[in-house]
Amino acid sequence: MAATDFIVAIELGSTEITGIAGKKNADGSIRILAYASERSSDCIKKGAIYNLDKTTQCLTSVIKELEETLHAPIRKVYVGIGGLSVRSIRNTESKQLGEDTKISQALIDSIMQSNREIPLIDREILAVEPQEYKVGNNLLTEPVGVPADYIEGHFLNIIARHSLKSNIKQCFKQTGYEVADYFLSPLVTANVVLSDSERRSGCALIDFGANTTTVSVYKNNILRHLAVIPLGSENITQDICSMHFEEEEGEQLKLRFGSAYTELSDNDEETNRSYNLDGRCTIPARQLEDIVEARVNEIITNVWNQIMVSGYGDKLLGGVVFTGGMTNLPNLDKAFTHITKIEKIRIAKSSEISLEGDIELPQDGTQNTLIGILASGKENCCRIDPRKGVQLSFTEDLQQKEAEAKRKEEERKLKEEEERRQAEEAERRHRIEEEKKRQEEERAMKRQKEYESYMETGPKACWEKRIIRQLFRKLNMQEP
């Protein structure tokens, strides 16, 4: 039986584009109805689209596969936004008030609007996280109703390049599917991975991706810092491949033998051992360990630097939470503790939301953002026939789409024909004007020549010659 009430979520990852359809239950759990994925490494890098056409093809393929599983047409989807250019910046807006003015919601809204209007070069604000409001000597999160003569709002703005969102819009416009809403990927991931206690006590959420690592710092249930580091698990694979291995071999060596942290050993057997990949390639164990650990240490050092930059490095009572595909690398938590001295670490390979249904998602930390997008969606994404007020069947929807595509193609051809006709008419008029101009110039030149000839041979010219002749005679001079 076809599903007619569901939510669809799409995540644009650097290794694959994933799509999911599900239905929310009354108890807060989600029933998974469909799942699809397509490789995206040749069209998305570090979370940003760089090939619009290939991304459009991948998106179309993913959504079509979801439709086939659902046996129902999809009208719109919810999309996650992330990537290297996403980061947080702090801003302060203040307003002088009359004496003992009661702060209203309208006043708070106006301060927030002023914050959104700050000038940014090649950037746009994707989300705003109010930090607190300074009223008198107090810092409040909910200042409405408090009398004051001055208020100062502190905001954390999440910004990104204009092209990040505009490229996504272009791709979905080409697919013919609507975007119900855009969600900031780090925020929705935190919604389904972090507990209320962790958010309140203070914690750092580290999402280890393929091309990027995202750092989100929370305290008192408020996002305090967000940064994206341009390093991920794929960098480890590339480092291994630099030892003259194919990419697939490097990935397999990492997955089968890689470790983020290894205890030093003086045992000769341990020192001289090697790793063999099904007889295809061999690498000394110590060499592989050094390669993996060096890159992991670099990533963790950058992560820790961002946590310290946030100003909350010593306030993370809730510890650190890991998620993302790189969490499958053994001893990642030990490596983090070795560098940062933080021991309270939790690895979240699945979300806090209960999932049900016949479709089982990978429990490796790679699907948490997708689940977060799905959980944040609210509207039914099934296509509805506006004439009947009911959901179209999959076949009817395909027929309607084909008819619509045919109509648009005919309109396009008519438009092109009209443009061609107008261009030909404009060209014809141009040629006529040019011919008129040429003929007018020829007539003008002819009149000029006739005038010059007249001046040389006409009556006036003859009279002038007689006067000159008589003058020469009177002066007894020989005519020239």
Predicted regions and their residues:
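Residue-level signature of catalytic and energy-coupling elements of molecular machines
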Residues: 9-10, 19, 79, 172, ...
